[in-house]
């Protein structure tokens, strides 16, 4: 691909006086930035001009004739205060810093706020996501000297998603906090998503003061029931003296049970004087499982003729990718990724077969259909990950299933199993390898034959993806035909989503992290997202909420600032969380967002196509330019309406992110064609009995 360079070609977007970039080497590619028609544009120019008054050292470089010496000296902050004193205050006062990040030891006198903060220090907390509030202000006041950064967000749902993303990429706690009442209720949806992703998120929920409980006061709410379905543990501080105890337990349980916990604190319990000791973190070491179940699994694997491994989220969370690889190589077994766990096995490995489940890999499905033994390593084998797809009911009903799960309640929950192992994916894989080492396996004799079959199935699937340029159902063919003469607002053409996804796949940088939202095009992307290392792919899992991808990726970027970060979203889901672009810009957390602008709620509209005779109700979306909105929020914006621009646009945005620390939104104009629905048995054909509705069938 040719390098992106500056260009003097004319832009096709009205209001843009200067082009952004083009590709050298004979191509006339132009990447167009959205025009900034924001009412804030003028103010932004004034702000830029104002800062131009300073020299490199921060001193005023210009003063009006006979201007007095600035009241607060010649530093930048002093000049600002003298110039605009009525309108701004100093952002913070000087604060002392802790010499180390170690928590205090031994029994000591402290305030409950100090006990709370010191317990977080003991657990290695460096970042918290939320919106400031009076309910926890006493603790918040000492976050900075404790070495803890509060990342202020636009909406608390975004904060909880950020904590989820932070936890999923780092393997450490993600922490979210908010004001009691509405600030806490705003987090419910995101905590539910974290629950289904098994993310160790600690939700800190300051509550109404104890003397006001039950009186229906301002922002009062019963906050524990809100989260009871989506937490592994809920701790309520019932005495300020127990602040450190409950805080520590919430952090311990989030890691040991791999899921969100809630710490509920009456707001008056942050104050006072207590004598306490900061507990040391307690970590539970998971084992490999029982001897009987391990031996039974080994016997099944030793006699298997066509073993297949299903690598799930437990492999990622247990840092077990290397052990999974070793086990696959010992067996010569193809490895399918669990649903939305595309980072659980490296895509470059010869035994990798791709993801199972909705919009997954045909190669993986065809291979697992031949299995006589399936080892589900760290996978709950959820419904979406095993449902029929591409016209294939591929799950091997006669195969012997070995399921390895850290959560014993998931064993045999969805699919019938032969052997269940309650164990850690890493420890179990090691134990199985040790037991298999001295054995002659029935599958040894056919390793080469199966390797050739794996290679052939993957090559066939890649060729099919290359040729699968657009959807082929009648509705999609109709809208493609209609779009032939239709121009985008910038004068280009609407692009086929599958071709777009293929081009994005080719342009992905090494070590990239990708989050996907819920929706039709995002679902189709499952076949095009491949990764080489774990903790790289984040999706809303079984909860399936919109507005997930952007804030989750902001949190992931906080945890891994050296890795490229890309969020996918459709235009419907994008509208729910795009305000967090302001969070990324304000706090210098650069990410890249790709918005598929197909002007509809695609996933649900597909049901109206299949079941309701194309009677479209509330599914159409006519939006302003998302790239333009991004510009108004201080980010960069790129509109893409030519296929050859897709890859260069992503590369340009990644360059902006990694080298200039800029957030960028790539708005890709897509046709209205639709991929297969999530499941075909989710609805039924309508039946009407009343005459006035008889035509609505």
Where are these regions (language model features)?
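Long, well-ordered, tryptophan-enriched scaffold segments
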Residues: 253, 435-472
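Short, Lys/Arg-enriched N-terminal segments with co-localized hydrophobic residues
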Residues: 79-94
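N-terminal alpha/beta PP-like core and its mobile active-site loop of ThDP/TPP-dependent enzymes
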Residues: 96-445, 507-510, 590-593, 630
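Low-acidity, Ser/Thr- and Arg-rich intrinsically disordered low-complexity segments
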Residues: 1-17, 22, 27-30, 38, ...
């Amino acid at each position: 691909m040719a390098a992106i360079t500056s260009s003097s070609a004319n832009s096709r977007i009205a209001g843009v006086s200067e082009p952004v970039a083009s590709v050298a080497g004979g191509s006339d590619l132009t990447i167009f930035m959205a025009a900034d028609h924001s009412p804030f544009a003028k103010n932004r120019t004034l702000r830029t001009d104002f800062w131009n008054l300073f020299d490199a050292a921060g001193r005023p470089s210009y003063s009006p004739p006979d201007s007095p010496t600035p009241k607060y000296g010649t530093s930048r902050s002093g000049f600002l205060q003298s110039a605009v004193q009525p309108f701004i205050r100093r952002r913070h006062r000087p604060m002392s810093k802790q010499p180390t990040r170690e928590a205090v030891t031994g029994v000591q006198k402290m305030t409950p706020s100090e006990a709370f903060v010191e317990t977080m220090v003991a657990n290695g907390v460096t970042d918290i996501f939320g919106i400031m509030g009076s309910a926890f202000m006493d603790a918040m006041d000492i976050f900075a000297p404790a070495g803890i950064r509060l990342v202020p967000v636009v909406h608390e749902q975004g904060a909880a998603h950020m904590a989820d993303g932070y936890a999923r990429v780092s393997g450490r706690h993600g922490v979210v906090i908010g004001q009691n009442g509405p600030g806490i209720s705003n987090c419910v949806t995101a905590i539910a998503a974290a629950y289904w992703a098994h993310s160790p998120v600690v939700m800190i929920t300051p509550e109404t003061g104890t003397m006001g409980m039950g009186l229906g006061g301002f922002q009062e709410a019963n906050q524990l029931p809100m989260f009871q379905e989506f937490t592994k543990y809920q701790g309520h501080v019932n005495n300020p003296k127990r602040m450190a105890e409950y805080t520590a337990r919430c952090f311990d349980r989030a890691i040991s049970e791999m899921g969100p916990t809630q710490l509920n604190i009456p707001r008056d319990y942050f104050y006072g004087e207590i004598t306490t000791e900061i507990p040391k973190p307690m970590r539970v070491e998971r084992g490999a499982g029982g001897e009987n179940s391990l031996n039974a699994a080994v016997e099944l694997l030793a006699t298997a003729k066509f073993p297949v491994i299903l690598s799930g989220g437990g492999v990622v969370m247990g840092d077990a990718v290397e052990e999974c690889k070793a086990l696959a190589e010992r067996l010569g077994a193809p490895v399918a990724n669990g649903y939305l766990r595309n980072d659980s096995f490296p895509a470059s490995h010869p035994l990798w077969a791709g993801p199972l489940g909705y919009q997954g890999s045909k190669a993986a499905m065809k291979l697992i259909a031949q299995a006589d033994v399936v080892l589900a390593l760290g996978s709950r084998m959820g419904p979406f990950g095993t449902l029929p797809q591409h016209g294939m009911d591929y799950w091997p009903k006669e195969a012997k299933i070995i399921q390895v799960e850290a959560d014993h309640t998931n064993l045999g929950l969805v699919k019938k199993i032969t052997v269940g192992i309650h164990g850690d994916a890493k420890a179990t894989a090691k134990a199985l390898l040790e037991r298999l080492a001295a054995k002659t396996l029935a599958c040894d004799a056919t390793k080469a034959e199966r390797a050739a079959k794996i290679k052939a199935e993957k090559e066939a699937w890649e060729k099919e993806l290359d040729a699968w340029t657009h959807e082929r159902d009648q509705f999609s063919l109709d809208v493609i035909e209609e779009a032939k003469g239709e121009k985008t607002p910038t004068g280009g053409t609407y692009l086929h989503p599958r071709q777009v996804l293929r081009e994005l796949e080719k342009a992905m940088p090494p070590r990239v992290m990708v989050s996907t939202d819920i929706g039709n095009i995002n679902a189709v992307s499952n076949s095009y997202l491949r990764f080489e290392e774990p903790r790289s792919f984040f999706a809303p899992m079984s909860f399936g909420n919109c507005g997930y991808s952007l804030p989750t990726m902001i949190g992931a970027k906080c945890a891994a600032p050296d890795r490229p970060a890309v969020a996918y979203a459709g235009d419907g889901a994008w509208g729910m969380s795009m305000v967090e672009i302001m969070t990324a810009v304000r706090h210098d957390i650069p990410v890249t967002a790709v918005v598929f602008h197909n002007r509809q709620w695609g996933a649900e509209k597909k049901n109206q196509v299949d079941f309701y005779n194309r009677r479209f109700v509330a599914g159409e979306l006519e939006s302003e330019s998302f790239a333009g909105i991004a510009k108004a929020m201080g980010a960069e914006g790129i509109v893409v309406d030519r296929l050859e621009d897709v890859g260069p646009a992503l590369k340009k945005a990644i360059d902006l992110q990694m080298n200039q620390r800029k957030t960028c939104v790539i708005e890709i104009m897509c046709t209205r064609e639709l991929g297969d629905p999530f499941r075909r048995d989710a609805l039924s054909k309508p039946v009407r009995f009343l005459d006035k509705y008889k035509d609505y069938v």
